[in-house]
Amino acid sequence: MRLIPLNTAEQVGKWAARHIVNRINAFKPTADRPFVLGLPTGGTPLTAYKALVEMHKAGEVSFKHVVTFNMDEYVGLPKEHPESYYSFMHRNFFDHVDIPAENINLLNGNAPDIDAECRQYEEKIRSYGKIHLFMGGVGNDGHIAFNEPASSLASRTRIKTLTHDTRVANSRFFDGDVNQVPKYALTVGVGTLLDAEEVMILVLGHQKAQALQAAVEGNVNHMWTISCLQLHPKAVVVCDEPATMELKVKTLKYFNELEAENIKGL
């Protein structure tokens, strides 16, 4: 596992965006051989999306031959609702870059057959071979996507009941009213994430410090979904300084020295 320790949330977003752009450009995608990118929602990736849009407008990257799969979607929330992940992605990213509409894949939380929707999502991912890079965030309790504590590390795309803590955390997007936050969501599984060629998780803020400590210094544990990254051959965690407060000094020193060339100039 790589840990990229930076100072600010803005630096995390810019580093992540640059990494994505470098991966896409090195891949040299075509219509017949697209780059497959997994994407998250929430507050954490906003700086990364902003940086990606800026780099696209500067002519540094095209998303014309990029196929995207989003991590999750609320169940029962109309896709036109401002807090649906469909709306979030179009508002913050898709509407500002040159990605074709047919290359965008989002789970349908209003599908008449939820199980079939989840099964077809997995099948579509497999039809591309694999996701080349999956970017994600993490919850205070260590969940990735909506794989809440005690999720199977072999799980696939499915419906999940959201914990009260997750709904409270997300209520900031619903005028602070937890009762407006859906109780269920569709989410890719831990196994889906682990199948990706590379997984990059962004960790911001002191409230995520315990989750980061569990990922880097703890044991693999289904109560801390983020710890599954230890099983992945190409996992990258990018964090700001407040998120490192639970790490041992020697751990942080080790990764600072290891990644010195990759964080220089930020």
From Swiss-Prot:
Active site per database record: D72, D141, H143, E148
GO molecular function term, any single one: identical protein binding
Protein activity control: Allosterically activated by N-acetylglucosamine 6-phosphate (GlcNAc6P).
Catalytic reaction equation(s): alpha-D-glucosamine 6-phosphate + H2O = beta-D-fructose 6-phosphate + NH4(+)
Entry keyword annotation includes Hydrolase: yes
Gene Ontology annotations of biological process type: carbohydrate metabolic process; glucosamine catabolic process; N-acetylglucosamine catabolic process; N-acetylneuraminate catabolic process
Database matches in NCBIfam families: nagB (TIGR00502), PRK00443.1-5 (NF001685)
Name of the protein in question: Glucosamine-6-phosphate deaminase
The species this protein was found in: Salmonella arizonae (strain ATCC BAA-731 / CDC346-86 / RSK2980)
